[in-house]
């Protein structure tokens, strides 16, 4: 640790690795999407041939489910690296106080986010705030959810005090208002626990009422709103242009690119060999996570003619690349929802029914399992809905 933490560049490299771990395939780069999507009313699993996927879609998850394991282990990998940084950052003597505070504030924000994801998915779990030097040290008893949430709030409050103001931060890195925005999100979660008590979230563990937690959520969100630290992008479609990174609407965004190999999540949403990306001999676009028919119907019933649909869904039909080496797919056209086998325009088309796709995350230069598409963890639009 002495060598790594001997210079500001070394400390920054450790912080960068924290971002790398949380955005890798075990986290926002892939498996977290799968774990949290298939069982919801808005998303659906198209292919039910995989046992572990069906378990997630039906919320009947076996103890050895690999996706749950990946997410759990990946979050603790981030946490362990943050813990190491927080323990050893003091070894760096050549760092300004402002730089020290900025790095520690970002690290605490990432640790809070990691535990926030874990506690909402798994309930009570081990709280580890020091780097584990051995397997034995990493095996700790579970901590109750009220204490976990208290520690999450503590990290976010410290991040609020340590992170720089907007304008004093480097582009693409969170400033202090991100911590305040996440505090609002945490208090929303606590209000929901109080309003909907039940295992694994024992509402009796929390001393405030749902109304009080809603008020705390509102107060923190209102502070962010009044700060004018964020704003909505004028054109909704611009959010999904892969070159538009870290817009004024982005509160926290994971930087992903094909060099680091941290962005396999895109192919979880797109169809294989789709002409929108130049794949030729690989079907890395699996399209495993799809909007449900009900979600598509509700959107179109509520907002008929909504221009946002074009940049949100890939629907009706799509065509495969003409350069695909496999001639069975080359140039082939597929009809997808809202077309069904009863109303396909071309009656020679396969009678299989296909769900629509999400088309928000598209890198047209994508040729393999990774891409240059960032993932926005938290948008200002999300905060405005608090």
Question: Model segments located where?
Answer:
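An aromatic- and glycine-enriched ligand-binding surface/loop that stacks and positions planar moieties
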Residues: 1-52, 86, 125, 149, ...
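Conserved, well-structured interaction surfaces
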Residues: 7-8, 12-26, 47-122, 136-150, ...
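Short, flexible active-site-proximal loops enriched in glycine and acidic residues
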Residues: 122-128
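Acidic, serine/threonine/proline-rich low-complexity intrinsically disordered regions
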Residues: 129-132, 139-142, 194-215, 374-386
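Short, flexible loop/turn elements at secondary-structure junctions
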Residues: 131-134, 256-258, 313, 382
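C-terminal substrate/ligand-recognition segments
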Residues: 307-386
């Amino acid at each position: 640790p002495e060598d790594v933490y001997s210079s500001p560049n070394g400390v920054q490299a450790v912080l960068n690795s924290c971002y790398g771990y949380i955005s890798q395939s075990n986290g926002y780069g892939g498996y977290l999407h799968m774990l949290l999507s298939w069982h919801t009313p808005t998303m659906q699993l198209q292919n039910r041939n995989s046992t572990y996927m069906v378990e997630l879609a039906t919320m009947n998850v076996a103890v050895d489910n690999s996706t749950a394991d990946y997410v759990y282990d990946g979050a603790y990998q981030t946490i362990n690296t943050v813990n190491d940084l927080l323990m050893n950052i003091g070894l760096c003597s050549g760092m300004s106080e402002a730089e020290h505070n900025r790095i520690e504030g970002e690290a605490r924000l990432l640790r809070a986010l990691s535990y926030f994801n874990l506690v909402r998915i798994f309930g009570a779990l081990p709280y580890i705030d020091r780097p584990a030097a051995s397997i034995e040290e990493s095996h700790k008893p579970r901590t109750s959810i009220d204490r976990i949430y208290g520690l999450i709030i503590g990290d976010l409050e410290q991040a609020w005090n340590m992170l720089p103001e907007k304008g004093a931060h480097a582009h693409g890195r969170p400033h202090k208002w991100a911590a305040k925005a996440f505090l609002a999100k945490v208090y929303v979660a606590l209000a929901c626990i109080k309003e909907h008590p039940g295992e694994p979230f024992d509402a009796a563990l929390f001393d405030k009422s749902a109304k009080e937690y809603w008020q705390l959520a509102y107060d923190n969100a209102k502070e962010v709103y009044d700060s004018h630290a964020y704003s909505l992008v004028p054109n909704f479609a611009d959010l999904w242009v892969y070159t538009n990174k870290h817009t004024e609407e982005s509160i926290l965004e994971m930087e992903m690119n094909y060099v680091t190999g941290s962005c396999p999540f895109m192919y979880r949403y797109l169809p294989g060999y789709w002409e929108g990306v130049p794949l030729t001999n690989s079907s890395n676009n699996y399209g495993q996570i799809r909007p449900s028919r009900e979600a598509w119907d509700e959107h179109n019933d509520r907002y008929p003619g909504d221009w946002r649909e074009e940049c949100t869904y890939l629907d009706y039909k799509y065509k495969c690349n003409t350069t695909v080496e496999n001639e069975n797919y080359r140039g082939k056209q597929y009809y997808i929802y809202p077309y069904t086998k009863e109303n396909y325009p071309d009656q020679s088309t396969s009678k299989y029914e296909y769900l629509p796709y999400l088309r928000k995350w598209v890198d047209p230069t994508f040729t393999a399992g990774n891409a240059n598409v960032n993932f926005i963890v938290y948008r200002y639009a999300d905060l405005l809905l608090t």
